[in-house]
Amino acid sequence: LINVIAGNSSEDLAKKISKKLKANLIKSELKIFPDGESKITLKGKFVRGKTIVVQSIYPPVDSNLIQALALISKAKEYSSEVIIVVPYLGYARQDREFLPGEIVTMKVIGKLLKGAGATRIIVTDIHSKIGLQQLGLKSKNVSAIPELVKYFKKLKLENPLVVSPDQGGKGRANEFAKVFKLDFIALQKVRDRKTGKVKIKNQKISEVRDRDLILVDDMISTGGSIVKATEFLKKQKCRRVFVTCTHALLINDAEKKIKKAGVTRIISTNSIPGKTSVVDISNIIAKAIK
């Protein structure tokens, strides 16, 4: 028998996972006090067996992390095996010491999850495989690419081409293109480590002309890279630009900025719930748990 605890950040996704596993769903009620503290009350009874905690760690990252730890800790009182499902794992970009004195927060997160009682972690399209190793926990990284491609196949696209906004995302765009049986290209971007400013290095790309483009990324935060890439591609006389990612954080008015740059649509998964999260990953997560 399996228990699934629905964390506040992933309520809907947890319900779907629970249904697919025919599990015992335990809901959680969250109360935030005026001083910012959170208090969680679980609603439901535990059955004997392993427990899955589903809690995505997106903004407010620290609150969602503390809540995940609290849920794991409670689950551990009833189950010896506690699997934490964190579709979007905040801090995944802090996976190494880029500048002297920086703290590799992923190592800290690993200690916290283990200390709370997690025996295994399941994530979706983590930003860096190195980060996953830093956790020091038994882990599984599930790819949402097949699910995203399935969705795009239903759209009527005109001679589509897959584009990576930078060289770093080449592998991901290549995988997306392979599953979709399409070609792909990668732009070259330079980011200033100190200011975070981004610019595109390419001069001209002829193969995008009059084609629908699918810009593929693992996550979109402020949308800076996507905006720069879209503006560049629009200048090259492409047709429409679609943006897809697993995790759409879309901080502040990122969505507005991206649309203003000329993007037709943003399509993301429900690792982070929102307007763009039309692709469901409960299936692939349920498979990973089994």
Short names for language-model regions:
Residues L1-K290:
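PRPP-associated nucleotide enzymes
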